Amino acid sequence: MIMKRFLRRLLNLNIWGGRHTELKHLQQTLPSHLRGSRESKEALKELVNKEFIILKISTGEKHVSLNSHKQKEIYDFMQE
């Protein structure tokens, strides 16, 4: 559920490839009691392991974007 929220946010903002956003903006999609929790960190780690999300360090902060090479897999995952 948390992974789908993260992906839905990035899809709605059209954050693919070179376009990226700060990780804290992605965590704002979650209710306040889940922000920064172990579950949200594990969900983010799982998305990175599946290569759905690309992590980038920019301006000293972690930035994320969707992997454009995994577009079909991301849309299939969202349909499940």
Regions found by a protein language model. Name each.
Residues W16-L30:
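Short acidic, hydrophobic short linear motifs in intrinsically disordered regions
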Residues E42-L44, L55, V64:
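Charged interaction/catalytic cores of defense and host-pathogen modules
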Residues V48-S58:
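A short, conserved structural fragment
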Residues H69-E80:
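Short, amphipathic alpha-helical interaction segments positioned at domain boundaries
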Residues G60-N67:
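Minor-groove-contacting beta-hairpin "wing" of winged helix-turn-helix DNA-binding domains
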Residues H33-N49:
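Short amphipathic alpha-helical interaction segments
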Residues M1-G18, M78-E80:
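Short alpha-helical segments that sit at the start of domains
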